[in-house]
Amino acid sequence: MAVERKFVQERLKKLMVKEWIKDEVRSAGFGGVDILRTPLGTQVTLFVERPGLVIGKGGRRIKALTEKLKDFGIENPQVSVDEVEKPEFNAQLMASLLARALERGWYFRRAGYRFLYRIMEAGAKGCEIEISGKLVSERARTEKFVAGTIVHTGDPAESMVQKGFDIAIKKLGVLGVSVRIIPPDVTLPDEFEVKDVNIEHLRGESGEDEGDKGDEQGGEAQEAEGAGA
């Protein structure tokens, strides 16, 4: 049980660190975080839309983040910041930006379709956006925006679909924003390619095969006649 408890504690600590970092770099466009333990310490890589806001003037903000991570029990944290190369294919970043737009007063339906159009125009194979909560009244509900192909079950839903989630704090309450994206470079299990076939080339190969068979049969017949003589 001690081993299982240790793994649970490590996962819980990573989750707490991720949620704290998400709140700290919210204005920079949070796109995810990788936490990797190495022999020299713990490598923490932040993926954001605007790295300059995370680094700060003279690197002061990133130094403050590094010191704060030590309070979570992370040994010798080494923080690096990477810019998200293709924001439209990063589901976590899209969820964060959509949540910030809702907090600024965007109407939920306008925001949902705007981000759906942006993601699909970038070349995504499919996108699904869900906004849940008290959208227009005291009664909570869920509004869904879908385009293209989205997989919900099986291994493809886990390995091929980018997922992101964030919250928007409104006067009526908290809205949950969920984004699922299938990038354009993903090959789905039901996709296949029909290659062009050169019919003349196949006919030529077929003729050569028949000719070879005829030569072999002729040679066998001559050998049989020679043996009979």
UniProtKB/Swiss-Prot annotation:
One of the record's GO cellular component terms: cytosolic small ribosomal subunit
* Region annotation Disordered: where it falls in the sequence: 202-229
Biased composition of type Low complexity is found at 219-229
| Alphabetical list of InterPro entries matching this protein | KH_dom (IPR004087), KH_dom-like_a/b (IPR015946), KH_dom_type_2 (IPR004044), KH_sf_prok-type (IPR009019), Ribosomal_S3_C_sf (IPR036419), Ribosomal_uS3_arc (IPR027488), Ribosomal_uS3_C (IPR001351), Ribosomal_uS3_euk/arc (IPR005703)
Domain KH type-2: start-end pairs: 17-85
What GO annotations for molecular function exist for this entry?
A: rRNA binding; structural constituent of ribosome
Instruction: Summarize subunit and interaction data from the UniProt record for this chain.
Output: Part of the 30S ribosomal subunit.
What the protein does? Binds the lower part of the 30S subunit head.
Task: Fetch the HAMAP family from UniProt.
Answer: Ribosomal_uS3_A (MF_01309_A)
Q: What is this protein called?
A: Small ribosomal subunit protein uS3
